[in-house]
Amino acid sequence: MPAAKRAKKATRAKKSTKAAIPAATKKILLVDDDAEIIESMRTILEAKGYTVMVARDGSQGIAVAERENPDLVILDTMMPKRSGFLVLEKLRREYGHPIHIIMVTANEVNRHRAYAEMLGVDDYIRKPFAMERLLESVQKLLA
């Protein structure tokens, strides 16, 4: 094989390795008031190597996001102090750098999904959901 082809192939291999950046370099903020759901998501995400932070309500979620600069936020829609919609709106309007946001909800109302999409949510997942579905979305957004 000519040297130029070998070099090109090696460069491609390095790029594909870079594309598979270790999950440990990615920070995820979970914002949900349901401790059981938080622990389920945290267990799966930490097992995949992500750094996981937790906030138990919307106000705390905004504060943690501003302080920790996560790469992705997984956000419940219905929480005390501030709804997920208000958190989504504030993060999209005032956050200092691009951030991916996934909303999770037990609500079946389609207008809520439309509102979340209007505010700029990256994915909208209805509860109960398979953790594989969530993980697939996380991996896609953080690729």
Please describe what each predicted stretch is:
Residues D34, T77-M78:
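The short loop immediately C-terminal to the conserved phospho-acceptor aspartate in CheY-like receiver
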Residues I38, P80-K81, V109:
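The feature encodes the CheY-like receiver
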Residues E39-A47:
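Charged docking surfaces used in two-component/phosphorelay signaling
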Residues D57-Q60, S83-V87:
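Acidic catalytic/metal-coordinating carboxylates
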Residues E68-I74:
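Active-site beta3 strand of CheY-like receiver
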Residues L86, E108-D123, E136:
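Alpha4 helix (beta4-alpha4-beta5 surface) of REC/receiver domains from two-component response regulators
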Residues F129-Q139:
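C-terminal output helix
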